A protein has these predicted regions:
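C-terminal extensions
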Residues: 1-29, 33-87
């Protein structure tokens, strides 16, 4: 499953979060209920974590959630997450 792929994600950069801290990730354009569940399964729960995604991490996440290559970057999740944090 998706959770098994969490090992490939660079959490040293993203930071670790728990389900109790989770943000409504569907606020980000490009994330629907299905993808949100996959991100939660990976251990990605917060805007803060998503805002810290580098191009490498975006690709790691793409692979882990079986998304189209480049999709996370194209939808600018990191930029959107940063904007929600500043709001």
């Amino acid at each position: 499953g998706v959770a098994a792929k969490a090992d490939s994600i660079d959490f040293a950069t993203l930071g670790v979060a728990t389900a109790s801290e989770k943000d409504d990730l569907q606020t980000i354009k490009g994330i629907g209920p299905f993808i949100e569940e996959k991100l939660y399964a990976l251990g990605i729960y917060t805007f803060s974590q998503i805002s810290k995604m580098t191009p490498e991490i975006e690709e790691e996440v793409n692979v882990a959630i079986e998304f189209f290559p480049g999709r996370v970057k194209r939808d600018e999740w990191a930029r959107q997450a940063s904007e929600f944090l500043q709001a």
